[in-house]
Swiss-Prot record:
Transmembrane segments: none annotated. This is Imidazoleglycerol-phosphate dehydratase. GO terms for molecular function: imidazoleglycerol-phosphate dehydratase activity. Its main location: cytoplasm. It catalyses: D-erythro-1-(imidazol-4-yl)glycerol 3-phosphate = 3-(imidazol-4-yl)-2-oxopropyl phosphate + H2O. GO terms for cellular component: cytoplasm.
Length: 194
């Protein structure tokens, strides 16, 4: 079976982004988002989802991190959606509960063709390194919207903001790895399409 791949670019007055990914990868990554902590989160996402990701972003981070973070989530969601094609054979659902030291995150995803985000996490710090924590939820919202997926993310408990954010990215990565897995040759929907 050929590997499922995608390439997406997005150029606006605020950002210039290119992504190439392989769903059936090994978790190899080359990430240059312009936001160091986001690089770390996307590297973790790639490694634990086993999705190979090459991403570059030139953005107006001198203004703030909003445009780059939002647009990166848009291209990531679009690229995964493109690589999934008609979603024939995918498991469709995935879930994970992942610890990161004292923090525990739960993620569930349905690659349903419908966008929805449930997000329940509170961060005690306004930033982690150069990432605004208010943008964590917005990243996942934009990802869900452009992936056309239901995503549920929760911090069940935790104290350290870095650990909470990383646990969210890792739990979604593991859930995604399960959801994109090929398990049959049919579309997992009574409608016949996803």
């Amino acid at each position: 079976m050929p590997k499922r791949r995608a390439r997406v670019t997005r150029k606006t007055k605020e950002t210039d982004i290119a992504i190439e990914l392989v769903l059936d990868g090994n978790g190899k990554y080359e990430i240059q988002s312009g936001i160091r902590f986001l690089d770390h989160m996307l590297e973790s996402f790639s490694k634990h989802s086993r999705i190979d990701i090459a991403l570059t972003c030139t953005g107006d981070v001198d203004v703030d991190d909003h445009h780059s973070i939002e647009d990166i989530a848009i291209v990531l969601g679009s690229a995964i959606s493109q690589a999934l094609g008609d979603k024939r054979g995918i498991q469709r659902y995935g879930w994970a509960i992942i610890p990161m030291d004292e923090s525990l995150a739960r993620a569930a995803i349905d690659l349903s063709g419908r966008s929805y985000l449930f997000f329940d996490a509170v961060f005690d710090r306004p930033t982690v390194s150069d990432l605004s924590t208010e943008m964590v939820e917005h990243f996942f919202f934009s990802l869900a919207e452009h992936l056309k997926a239901n995503i549920h993310l929760e911090i069940l408990h935790g104290k350290n903001t870095h650990h909470k954010v990383e646990a969210l990215f890792k739990s979604l990565a593991v859930a995604m790895r399960e959801a994109v897995k090929i398990t049959s040759n049919e579309v997992l929907s009574t409608k016949g399409v996803i």
